[in-house]
């Protein structure tokens, strides 16, 4: 299953000016997701907006939550299951 994840923090919790904190939090998210066995199809960031975006393939919501754990103290995450748009449109138009 494919999930779209948005993580948001604010300027008060932003670790950008503390390299050690960046390494311990957001710097650990991709390795942590990989450790959970998740496939990360893409990861993007909007630095001035304090937003991170991930597309992750997983069989387990719980594994995603565990994989995001290093960044949990920094803000909030929205984890949404999504499906292929073209495939959905084909199903809709064929029924």
Where are these regions (language model features)?
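Short S/T/G/P-rich N-terminal loop/turn motif that feeds into the first structured element of a domain
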Residues: 1-35, 39-50, 84-95
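Short hydrophobic/aromatic beta-strand micro-patches
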Residues: 8, 55-57
